[in-house]
Amino acid sequence: MSAATDEILEKLKTLTLLEAAELVKQIEEAFGVSAAAPAGGMVMMAPGAGAAAPAEEVEEKTAFDVVLDDVPADKKIAVLKIVRELTGLGLKEAKEVVESTPKPIKEGISKEDAEAAKKQLEDAGGKVSIK
């Protein structure tokens, strides 16, 4: 690949899921294309191939979202500190996240990072799920 395409690829890797979805919409509008899979795509598959596909998709999941589901009132300050540490948000933004649960804290991260973030938030008193 050329240096220009390598640079674009590296920038794409840093996007959050929300930013990537927004980019897809903008590309669809700008170029008049659709990112949706063709409707007849499943018909062309060999019999039996369709049964294996869902299992492969589950195994291939490499990006996880850490969602803060609930924060007890007496644990808000401790959880707020961890949210700021994990996200780099300012005090006001982190407070809004903690007070508007359920809310994603980190998106599109590795399983190890998601588990570490979950442990930190749970140790501080928050209820967390990984999706």
UniProtKB/Swiss-Prot annotation:
Entry-linked Pfam families: Ribosomal_L12, Ribosomal_L12_N
Keyword flag Ion transport: no
Highest taxon in the source lineage: Bacteria
InterPro entries according to UniProt: Ribosomal_bL12, Ribosomal_bL12_C, Ribosomal_bL12_C/ClpS-like, Ribosomal_bL12_oligo, Ribosomal_bL12_oligo_N_sf
Compositionally biased intervals (Basic and acidic residues): 100-125
GO terms assigned for molecular function: mRNA binding; structural constituent of ribosome
Keyword field contains Electron transport: no
GO cellular component entries: cytosolic large ribosomal subunit
Residue ranges, annotated region (Disordered): 100-131
Gene Ontology BP term (one): translation
UniProt entry keywords in alphabetical sequence: Ribonucleoprotein, Ribosomal protein
Task performed by this protein: Forms part of the ribosomal stalk which helps the ribosome interact with GTP-bound translation factors. Is thus essential for accurate translation.
Family according to the record: Belongs to the bacterial ribosomal protein bL12 family.
Self-association and partners: Homodimer. Part of the ribosomal stalk of the 50S ribosomal subunit. Forms a multimeric L10(L12)X complex, where L10 forms an elongated spine to which 2 to 4 L12 dimers bind in a sequential fashion. Binds GTP-bound translation factors.
Record protein name field: Large ribosomal subunit protein bL12
Provenance organism: Cyanothece sp. (strain PCC 7425 / ATCC 29141)
